[in-house]
Amino acid sequence: MQTTELVRFKKLGKQISVLTAWDAISSSIVEAAGADVVLVGDSLGMVVLGHSTTLPVTLDQMLHHTKAVCRGFCKPLSKQPLVVCDLPFLSYQCGEDKAVEAAGTLLKNSTASAVKLEGAEPETLLVIKRLIRMGIPVMGHLGLTPQSVHQLGYKSQARDKDSQEKIFKDSKMLQESGCFAIVLEHIPGEIASRLKKHIDIPVIGIGAGNDCDGQVRVTADILGLSIAQPPFAKPLLAGRELCINALKEWINSTDLDQVNPTTKTSESKSDC
């Protein structure tokens, strides 16, 4: 999957599916499910590493998880989902050179194809333009931006006229700077719907209504594995409960071999 395919999907009216992954197991599952894009998000700081925000996530951690995600795919490279990885906090806010080095490190040492960063401040736009000149595709992110949690909080954005006008202006600037798509997080659905028609690149929503060019979700939220479930991410599976019950059954079994006999294990089929 190439970034240009997503723009083509928008023109065709085809919905774009984006799911997160953080290791080889999760990426193999997401690939088998048919996701168009796999996002190695800095949300792994909360989902996997146990932090309360995304801010502590380091570039080394993002590289570690991105490499694991890329190793988990079964299909040939040309048929794999597009892999986008987040640039973590302070890897791009401190200047263009540092941003190029961070993005280059992620893409050079994995099979990821693009990076995502938050906001549309003048300094951020300069970073985006520099990255694109260096041949690194960039996905933007507006609305609720988790790396700005101490300034904006974890609450819905673009609720008043001024902030709505700003998000329209920012989306246009991200497009003009060269972004191939924009994530809109936790904004009113009617604003996202209008914004989708305002720009030519895909608008990927999360908590932004159903009328976007695509949707992105944290995979653990869909599977019901998260302890704290976001209000806009309805689980489609009681995954946490299922896992706990399965493990309890194994722990409480008087004959562990009978719970999962080796004969059945050897007959299991791989998705690859």
From Swiss-Prot:
This is 3-methyl-2-oxobutanoate hydroxymethyltransferase. CDD domains: KPHMT-like (cd06557). The active site is at E185. Pathway: Cofactor biosynthesis; (R)-pantothenate biosynthesis; (R)-pantoate from 3-methyl-2-oxobutanoate: step 1/2. PANTHER family: 3-METHYL-2-OXOBUTANOATE HYDROXYMETHYLTRANSFERASE. One of its GO terms (biological process) is pantothenate biosynthetic process. GO terms for molecular function: 3-methyl-2-oxobutanoate hydroxymethyltransferase activity; magnesium ion binding. The keyword Glycoprotein does not apply. InterPro entries: Pantoate_hydroxy_MeTrfase, Pyrv/PenolPyrv_kinase-like_dom, Pyrv_kinase-like_dom_sf.
